[in-house]
Design a protein with these regions (language model features):
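Structured beta-strand/loop patches that form or line metal/cofactor-binding pockets in enzymes
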Residues: 1-45, 49-54, 330-332
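Metal- or metallocofactor-binding catalytic centers and their adjacent structured scaffolds
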Residues: 5, 37-114
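Flexible C-terminal active-site loop/helix
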Residues: 6, 11-15, 297-364
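Active-site beta->alpha loop and helix N-cap motifs at the rims of alpha/beta catalytic domains
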Residues: 113, 117, 136-147, 152, ...
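N-terminal small/glycine-rich loop or linker at the start of catalytic domains
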Residues: 115-140, 259
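Active-site mouth loops of central-metabolism enzymes
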Residues: 131-145, 165-166, 194, 198, ...
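Catalytic domains of carbohydrate-active enzymes, especially glycoside hydrolases
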Residues: 153-164
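Catalytic core of soluble alpha/beta enzymes
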Residues: 163, 169-306, 310, 332-335
Length: 364
């Protein structure tokens, strides 16, 4: 591989509807897009989603990181070069995970096209084997919008839901009641509080007041409150999903001793790219900790495709997948056709199967 061009641009795609949770309200994507071109004229694309409340990044900081190191990345000519740079600059990537994710993904896409292999084969694996099934994520919209969205999901055959907790007890209870009243066999609901509560007793009281049955609680307390989460898990009898509280492999010693209390939400952009996401998933498997392969709100087909590698490789510890929303949420995707779930949350691999790199067709 000989790279002749490497660029980063910001990406803002309008949403079809505003998405709200306890940490943010979004009407557009907030992402960076990296384009890598080889001397042969092949092009690789990468995406990252900076989130200040998750990793401390912004689009501006991602662009500054890119400008500072672009010349070094231009010299990468192989998978070994990419891995060597990532390993040597691990601390720097810890502070710029979404930016590095975009760069790494573009390079993997380009390498795959140069080698005429899909990215998972470039990484030493086998081609993906679908189908993949996604959860429905319900945000904090007003109840009329929530109810309409819920009806659509249920009619489409979804049984796995993630419900954002907004902190208005009556409104949250109404949402839980609507899910319960659906009477869907095998219905699974997990709550995501986006670090809403400061105290364990406060969280316990609120969750019990919702009068629902939940499979897991995501980020109920302040970021990094592992002791509080342990106590809450034991009290409520369900595991805690760590998202903002788990962003790098070095945090495993904090949770490995009691694997039954935890689930990890592995979002590729948050973890700092596919290689690091797979490293975390492998360590989770060794520790007996299940995973969710998650997504940032507003991801395009690029990050959807990358996350499939983690989900496919670690199916034996995978409890849920999030994302693949495509133009269900976005006014448009970068790819045609977009990678997005269909009936029952299922995504077939026919869109990209057998194609090199990411296997996506870019319309924009």
């Amino acid at each position: 591989l000989r790279m002749c061009s490497l660029t980063m641009t910001s990406l803002e795609i309008p949403f079809r509807q505003v998405f709200t949770h306890a940490s943010a309200t979004r009407a557009t994507t907030e992402a960076v897009l990296v384009r890598a071109e080889s001397a042969r004229g092949l092009v690789g694309m990468g995406e990252g989603c900076p989130r200040q409340y998750v990793t401390g990044e912004t689009v501006a900081s991602a662009q500054e990181f890119f400008r500072s190191h672009r010349a070094e990345w231009m010299t990468c000519s192989s998978m070994d070069d990419l891995q060597t740079w990532g390993t040597a600059h691990a601390d720097l990537i810890d502070r710029n995970p979404a930016a590095w994710c975009a760069v790494e993904t573009a390079c993997l896409d380009l390498l795959g096209k140069e080698l005429e292999q899909p990215i998972e084969v470039v990484l030493g694996g086998t081609p993906l084997s679908g189908p993949f099934r996604y959860s429905a994520v319900l945000g904090g919209e007003k109840f009329s919008s929530f109810e309409k969205q819920l009806r659509q999901y249920l009619a489409a055959g979804f049984i796995d839901f993630k419900l954002k907790v907004m902190g208005d007890l009556e409104a949250d209870r109404e949402r839980v009641a609507a899910l319960t009243a659906a009477g869907t066999p095998g219905l699974r609901v997990r709550l995501d509080a986006n670090n809403r509560w400061h105290r364990v007793d406060e969280a316990c009281e609120y969750i019990q007041s919702l009068q629902g049955s939940f499979t897991a609680l995501e980020e109920p307390l302040r970021v990094g409150d592992y002791e509080g989460c342990r106590a809450l898990s034991r009290h409520c009898g369900v595991p805690i999903i760590l998202d903002e509280s788990f962003v790098k492999v070095g945090q495993f010693p904090l949770i490995e001793g009691e694997p039954s209390l935890w689930i990890l939400n592995i979002r590729v952009s948050k973890m700092g790219g596919l290689l690091r996401a797979c490293t975390v998933a492998a360590r989770a498997k060794a520790a007996g900790i299940p995973i969710v392969v998650g997504a940032q709100v507003g991801e395009t087909s690029i990050l959807t495709r990358v996350a499939l590698v983690v989900a496919d490789r670690y199916r034996d510890i995978l409890i849920a997948q999030e994302g693949a929303v495509g133009t269900h949420l976005l006014e448009y995707d970068l790819c045609e056709p977009p990678l997005m779930f269909g009936r029952g949350g299922c995504l077939a691999d026919t869109v990209f199967y057998g194609r090199s790199g990411l296997g996506l067709s870019f319309a924009r």
